[in-house]
Amino acid sequence: MSDQQLDPQALQQEENTLIALRKEKLAAGRAKGQAFPNDFRRDSYCNDLQKQYVDKTKEELAEAAIPVKVAGRIMLNRGSFMVIQDMTGRIQVYVNRKTLPEETLAEVKTWDLGDIIAAEGTLARSGKGDLYVEMTSVRLLTKSLRPLPDKHHGLTDTEQRYRQRYVDLIVNEEVRETFRVRSQVIAHIRSFLMKRDFLEVETPMLQTIPGGAAAKPFETHHNALDMEMFLRIAPELYLKRLVVGGFEKVFEINRNFRNEGVSTRHNPEFTMLEFYQAYADYEDNMDLTEELFRELAQLVLGSTDVPYGDKVFHFGEPFVRLSVFDSILKYNPELTVADLQDIDKARAIAKKAGAKVLGFEGLGKLQVMIFEELVEHKLEQPHFITQYPFEVSPLARRNDENPNVTDRFELFIGGREIANAYSELNDAEDQAERFQAQVADKDAGDDEAMHYDADFVRALEYGMPPTAGEGIGIDRLVMLLTDSPSIRDVILFPHMRPQA
């Protein structure tokens, strides 16, 4: 009977038996005083050796007798040789019965897949061309008490992979590569901005007023101060306070928290880049964003063509720039300018499209609802969607030519919002009025409307220079660059319901 035919109880019993056997082996090691030593220091990594000596022949390696010390987890044990894995990759280690003591040879026979060992020896190459370490000494560093998933079927259950990411990382090289890329992307973003004189800062994660975005916050209680507080939904208002204070180019890469739905594109805890630069506008940020995205694609993929599922996104071409209003007309030719400019018609169109219309929305809000329902998912290639109505952009500067819209863009790729940016509103009186309008919307039933932040208005009253700001979703960006279908694939420990 295959393991796929066994019921869960039988599988659990089998695992318990294996765990018991491994615990017996650990107990024997403890009795000898050999459990969990911490005095080994490696001098080489597995994949570094593979790269460094790729051109060395069997004869050259034999003559050079290069000594190495490696360590890693046993992923394959054939008796005469083992394959170990460290953070860089894998290498074979050869069990030489002529050079290893009998006691060591006996211990090696008791080792299991998943055990972590330390090996010393010299590099050699097999007749098949594989690089390996001919061991002169080897010992157990850590006994693995739980068996790894079956090598033929692996860890394939998606929910189990998310819950036990540590096992997922051990057995799935592509998962390890995804998170290497994530680290690489964040490091490059830092370098990209610092080269342009941006200062990295940290702003509060606990806030008395949740601001900077339209979202539901997580609430908590500060016992020492006896006050309600919120996990931040965005760092924006604090970063702009820093611009007021004289830090004219700032950025932060950190987590935001929004008490909202979970999907393949949404996680309540997610990572954002936000950056602000004085004496710039939203069009400057478009140019900067295109440059950054092209560099990241080239870094990760070696090309500005980004494959995702059955599509290819072209980062090397100029990103399309289109207003909210014009995009609705372009992708819905049955609609007219008159339809979108009549509030009753716009409300009917939004309702028919499936938007949750509450009845108090203005024309601009309704236009955005129509855009979200009828256009957003159609924006496959990179699109900068501009000129968002001021009703839905309470922190953005009004457009000089049309005060009903703002100098704002959102970047969409693959039908998903990746970035949001605008020329910042620095008129304190206008900001106060917009906060008041947001409070009225909240009182009317809009849970995502913003609170009034009197201290932020006060900061603007000291004067903020003309500024452009932007937020980029790191998780969604990494999804694109790693061809990952779900946001949970690029978050190490995504939130899950407790197991029954």
Swiss-Prot record:
Keywords: Aminoacyl-tRNA synthetase, ATP-binding, Cytoplasm, Ligase, Magnesium, Metal-binding, Nucleotide-binding, Protein biosynthesis. It comes from the Bacteria. The keyword Cytoplasm applies. GO terms for molecular function: ATP binding; lysine-tRNA ligase activity; magnesium ion binding; tRNA binding. Its cofactor is Mg(2+). PROSITE patterns: AA_TRNA_LIGASE_II. GO terms for biological process: lysyl-tRNA aminoacylation. One of its GO terms (cellular component) is cytosol. This is Lysine--tRNA ligase.
